[in-house]
């Protein structure tokens, strides 16, 4: 076993990396409220795992979406638990994100030289809300359908480009199969990649600049 570790150590310098991670200075003013961002990340990882599990059974069609969710809840082993954890974790992620934003704002974490960290955080907040909007529609029940109809119709109030944006969100002039396909694609592919990229940038900035000092 030691030989295997030595082989990886020689090539990856695992010990040096571990020392760099564990020896990072933590200011004395840091308290439990500074963990809100990390809790948000944990919620996202739970979302990713449970969401990935449900993709094995969910069918993104207007005729089968609701019945596939019922199948997950009633027939799949622990399916009810996986979907419930996905829903609870989604709510917790949004709550933790909001509290994290308030903490950063109230402690001045957005000030120079951390402007880019703040901007990337705001983008992450928008992506998180987008996860909620797209995921809410996937069961394609009455609540999800009318939520999509309302949300996709809001941009129509924008002059000149409003109708174009709404048609882009719906995949046409009305809510239907194209809409569900787009929301499913966004929820399971586009948004996860976007949030991964901005999370990486966000964490690299925090790693580079450290935690902001007390007010």
UniProtKB/Swiss-Prot annotation:
Residues noted as binding heme c in the record, renumbered to the chain = 35
Which cofactors are required for activity?
heme b; heme c
Look up keyword Cell membrane and say if it applies: no
A single GO molecular function term of this UniProt record: electron transporter, transferring electrons within cytochrome b6/f complex of photosystem II activity
Q: Where in the cell is it found?
A: Cellular thylakoid membrane
> Record's Gene3D superfamilies?
Cytochrome Bc1 Complex, Chain C
Similarity field: Belongs to the cytochrome b family. PetB subfamily.
Q: What does this protein do?
A: Component of the cytochrome b6-f complex, which mediates electron transfer between photosystem II (PSII) and photosystem I (PSI), cyclic electron flow around PSI, and state transitions.
**Name listed for the protein in its UniProt record:** Cytochrome b6
Gene name of this polypeptide: petB
